[in-house]
Amino acid sequence: MLKNDRLLRALNRQPVDRTPVWLMRQAGRYLPEYRATRARAGSFLGMAKNPDIACEVTLQPLQRFPLDAAILFSDILTIPDAMGLELYFVEGEGPKFRHPVRDAAAIHRLGVPDMETELRYVMDAVRVIRRELDGSVPLIGFSGSPWTLACYMIEGGGSKEYARIKAMAFNAPELLHHLLGTVTDAVIAYLAAQRAAGAQALQVFDTWGGVLSPAMYREFSLPYLTRIARELERGTGAERTPLVLFGKGNGAYVADLAASGAEAVGVDWTISLADAAQRAGGRVALQGNLDPATLYGSPDAIRSEVAKTLDSYAQGNGGSREGHVFNLGHGMSPDMNPEHVGVLVEAVQSLSKR
């Protein structure tokens, strides 16, 4: 039995006593205790692949701030790593793959990993975290979106131009669809396994969907997000596990995402919550959408922006604050001040009381 079920109630558009709040990258380098754990573990992957350390890092922000959810400490690139692409990290450059997939032979060799063998460390982390949370708040599991994972798998790492994957979209769209289909199968299996291990809410991060034109988004990202929402077994009634579809630059597609079958849509700061709520039309909850850079502001500026965000949602939702989960529009940066995060959380709690 959850002691704090605000997140789950809000994602299901049920009444809550105040707006729940959690933050993308709430467990991260801005926390000195995270940096100490990382130094001890030796690397990011050394933390992510050790269930006990992943649990420790997941719980760190909850020991500082009265957040309404924990999110599994992991990485979106665990699936392609388990497919054999071999994930590694370069300081200052981010994630890379030793074996990117760029031709038909490589793509057709890919299969869905076994979730309790190749990705057992993730499921073990979920189980350990659930035990340690002891019902205090829900645990969110997550995956990257098929399009976003395919970007990394083809480019071999992060990119500014996405030239390789866009070239494939234009020159060999059927091959790209084959890859996206395989990755979607893996994402569905991965999220289902996290749910079976104990995740109580799920989120898909479509980090790079916003680099696509509207026509390409509707061909190469949206159908696969919709497939996840419709095919992922999440239970029924009060036991149903809510799914959030988050994307950077997805404001133009809120109505499409609201029709996907997901319980909630996460948006960034490039669309107002009032506009997003009107587009959603009451079909889904909304999550977001404070610009993370707000945390560089003064405490008064942070409180002011929190108030504006809460009011914007209510404005687009017929005056009601129900069905809103407060979050940033993207993850926090390493140089942000933990004290300012505390100001944000306190402001959401005090300003959103019903």
UniProtKB/Swiss-Prot annotation:
<dbReference type="InterPro" id="IPR000257">
    <property type="entry name" value="Uroporphyrinogen_deCOase"/>
</dbReference>
<dbReference type="GO" id="GO:0019353">
    <property type="term" value="P:protoporphyrinogen IX biosynthetic process from glutamate"/>
</dbReference>
<protein>
    <recommendedName>
        <fullName>Uroporphyrinogen decarboxylase</fullName>
        <ecNumber>4.1.1.37</ecNumber>
    </recommendedName>
</protein>
<keyword id="KW-0963">Cytoplasm</keyword>
<feature type="binding site">
    <location>
        <begin position="25"/>
        <end position="29"/>
    </location>
    <ligand>
        <name>substrate</name>
    </ligand>
</feature>
<feature type="binding site">
    <location>
        <position position="207"/>
    </location>
    <ligand>
        <name>substrate</name>
    </ligand>
</feature>
<dbReference type="InterPro" id="IPR038071">
    <property type="entry name" value="UROD/MetE-like_sf"/>
</dbReference>
<comment type="subunit">
    <text>Homodimer.</text>
</comment>
<keyword id="KW-0456">Lyase</keyword>
<dbReference type="Pfam" id="PF01208">
    <property type="entry name" value="URO-D"/>
</dbReference>
<dbReference type="GO" id="GO:0005829">
    <property type="term" value="C:cytosol"/>
</dbReference>
<comment type="function">
    <text>Catalyzes the decarboxylation of four acetate groups of uroporphyrinogen-III to yield coproporphyrinogen-III.</text>
</comment>
<feature type="binding site">
    <location>
        <position position="75"/>
    </location>
    <ligand>
        <name>substrate</name>
    </ligand>
</feature>
<feature type="site" description="Transition state stabilizer">
    <location>
        <position position="75"/>
    </location>
</feature>
<dbReference type="InterPro" id="IPR006361">
    <property type="entry name" value="Uroporphyrinogen_deCO2ase_HemE"/>
</dbReference>
<comment type="similarity">
    <text>Belongs to the uroporphyrinogen decarboxylase family.</text>
</comment>
<comment type="pathway">
    <text>Porphyrin-containing compound metabolism; protoporphyrin-IX biosynthesis; coproporphyrinogen-III from 5-aminolevulinate: step 4/4.</text>
</comment>
<feature type="binding site">
    <location>
        <position position="152"/>
    </location>
    <ligand>
        <name>substrate</name>
    </ligand>
</feature>
<keyword id="KW-0627">Porphyrin biosynthesis</keyword>
<feature type="binding site">
    <location>
        <position position="330"/>
    </location>
    <ligand>
        <name>substrate</name>
    </ligand>
</feature>
<dbReference type="GO" id="GO:0004853">
    <property type="term" value="F:uroporphyrinogen decarboxylase activity"/>
</dbReference>
<keyword id="KW-0210">Decarboxylase</keyword>
